[in-house]
Amino acid sequence: MKTVVFAYHDMGCLGIEALLAAGYEISAIFTHTDNPGEKAFYGSVARLAAERGIPVYAPDNVNHPLWVERIAQLSPEVIFSFYYRHLIHDKILQLAPAGAFNLHGSLLPKYRGRAPLNWVLVNGETETGVTLHRMVKRADAGAIVAQLRIAIAPDDIAITLHHKLCHAARQLLEQTLPAIKDGNILEIAQRENEATCFGRRTPEDSFLEWHKPASVLHNMVRAVADPWPGAFSYVGNQKFTVWSSRVHSHAPAAQPGSVISVAPLLIACGDGALEIVTGQAGDGITMQGSQLAQTLGLVQGSRLNSQPACAARRRTRVLILGVNGFIGNHLTERLLREDHYEVYGLDIGSDAISRFLNHPHFHFVEGDISIHSEWIEYHVKKCDVVLPLVAIATPIEYTRNPLRVFELDFEENLRIIRYCVKYRKRIIFPSTSEVYGMCSDKYFDEDHSNLIVGPVNKPRWIYSVSKQLLDRVIWAYGEKEGLQFTLFRPFNWMGPRLDNLNAARIGSSRAITQLILNLVEGSPIKLIDGGKQKRCFTDIRDGIEALYRIIENAGNRCDGEIINIGNPENEASIEELGEMLLASFEKHPLRHYFPPFAGFRVVESSSYYGKGYQDVEHRKPSIRNARRCLDWEPKIDMQETIDETLDFFLRTVDLTDKQS
């Protein structure tokens, strides 16, 4: 039976060996490159694959269409995943007629998600296990095929439990793989009401909070003992790691974090005391507790703390979903210019943010919000401010793919909004000037203008209505459940990195990018319905400064507000935009590399956007809320924005084949 395998870690190695022993034909193995910052105590899937003569790959994004196509060409009958660390897209799972199966290190539906081995120890569980289940779109939610229980002994630590899980996994696979091959398995649906889900753990999560019971801290020590990074605390500014510990239930009463004795090294906790049996000062060597006390200069009555005594104010953690997009990458640049922000980002690409990837306060994961729900929920919980910037926001897609617009722009964002409600996190949500629709007011006002859209048979309005409904949902959560929020409405922001010329080639871009492509390729500039529609164009730098001030939220003035961010002085028709762009193009130093101007061509909107499109004649913002809440005023003239945007795109064009 032909299979494609996704695998990593010891579980990946034993899963591959079990498949081969059961007579499966492995066409390819997908794994990960090792993280140099991670202590690799486990077997190498890549090395095993090479030794067995099996093709092995470690793509950054296995869900990329190119990899999906390559996997499809392998024609797998069944797919297996053994501790592969990325979610696998449904498009891949559907390639195998017999389905896809994942090995998970817990007794599902308990402990779905990441690091179940560590979490069961943190939580003081006495039982865990391994589960083989069918893979579905939602992580770890498919029907259970086989399950094996394991007792957790009081003296088990992470590595001993890991070895138990590996032994159990071998047994389970040896019993179950032949049945899958024969098509003779019994599947049991998971009980959703019993499900629990946990996110990934980082070394920073393992600090010892001395106000907690000693038993809780002891479980933390067990969960992250060597070869994991270890639980830690501080003496002043000196960090030390606790590798093994013991609970003392009847210790003398003392302030939590106080040293009760140094031989043994006994620390008072919220309930009981924790004996530090072995530990390590800084990057030194492991030593027994009394020697550690001497090394750290501890005496009876000394106080420990959970963070450095001189720790600076914690940086505000900002989660940006869609960080590689136009607003996301410019906002990241603005935030990192300051020293008090930590930016966490998710997107399906990284070309626009490559300049930040090595920044110590920028953390990026390449992924799709529709399949990385576990990662998103964990980071919503972890961060202070959430900006869900992912959306389809190009007009041609509103008529071309209305359901996809609804699914991404509404359904996926609603899930994120609910996470913010659940974890009581501040959300800064990108509404849109499109919500005003065909409003006839001279200035579109956030608090008074009516939101007017066309009939249902005009799918062009699905983006506007999706955003408007989310605005209303957020407002209701704010009113009824105390959600801290700000809605901002961008009015035609433009500048470098707005879309790209490849998107413009398929019509999926904003106006100025499409016009620049026409100039670059020597094709006529198309003026939809004559190009008389007027817009107020806003420089990205002005827009980002306003958005930055919303994040800063001086005096909490932005809470519960809707804020237009636009430049009412930069009003121009699309035809006028084209003329200004042409004038800038003709005097650009790279002009001679490109074809002659092919003129303007008037086209009907239905022939360009398709059936169901309606346009808006004017869209001018009132910016009184921005002035009041942000003390903000747009400053940059439209011509300057046009010149810089054009220059950016012209310098991205490969000129080698345009030499005269």
Swiss-Prot record:
Residues 314-660 are annotated as: Dehydrogenase ArnADH. It holds the Pfam family Epimerase. Its EC number is 2.1.2.13, 1.1.1.305. One of its GO terms (cellular component) is membrane. One of its GO terms (molecular function) is UDP-4-amino-4-deoxy-L-arabinose formyltransferase activity. Keywords: Antibiotic resistance, Lipid A biosynthesis, Lipid biosynthesis, Lipid metabolism, Lipopolysaccharide biosynthesis, Multifunctional enzyme, NAD, Oxidoreductase, Transferase. UDP-alpha-D-glucuronate binds at residues 393, 398, 432-433, 460, 492, 526-535, 613. The record marks 140 as: Raises pKa of active site His. NAD(+) binds at residues 347, 368-369. One of its GO terms (biological process) is lipopolysaccharide biosynthetic process. Pathway: Nucleotide-sugar biosynthesis; UDP-4-deoxy-4-formamido-beta-L-arabinose biosynthesis; UDP-4-deoxy-4-formamido-beta-L-arabinose from UDP-alpha-D-glucuronate: step 1/3; Nucleotide-sugar biosynthesis; UDP-4-deoxy-4-formamido-beta-L-arabinose biosynthesis; UDP-4-deoxy-4-formamido-beta-L-arabinose from UDP-alpha-D-glucuronate: step 3/3; Bacterial outer membrane biogenesis; lipopolysaccharide biosynthesis. Residues 1-304 are annotated as: Formyltransferase ArnAFT. It comes from the Bacteria. The record marks 102 as: Transition state stabilizer. PANTHER family: BIFUNCTIONAL POLYMYXIN RESISTANCE PROTEIN ARNA, UDP-D-APIOSE_UDP-D-XYLOSE SYNTHASE 2. Bifunctional enzyme that catalyzes the oxidative decarboxylation of UDP-glucuronic acid (UDP-GlcUA) to UDP-4-keto-arabinose (UDP-Ara4O) and the addition of a formyl group to UDP-4-amino-4-deoxy-L-arabinose (UDP-L-Ara4N) to form UDP-L-4-formamido-arabinose (UDP-L-Ara4FN). The modified arabinose is attached to lipid A and is required for resistance to polymyxin and cationic antimicrobial peptides. Homohexamer, formed by a dimer of trimers. NCBIfam families: PRK06988.1, PRK08125.1, PRK11908.1. In the N-terminal section; belongs to the Fmt family. UDP-L-Ara4N formyltransferase subfamily. This is Bifunctional polymyxin resistance protein ArnA. It comes from Escherichia coli O7:K1 (strain IAI39 / ExPEC). The lineage of its organism: Bacteria, Pseudomonadati, Pseudomonadota, Gammaproteobacteria, Enterobacterales.
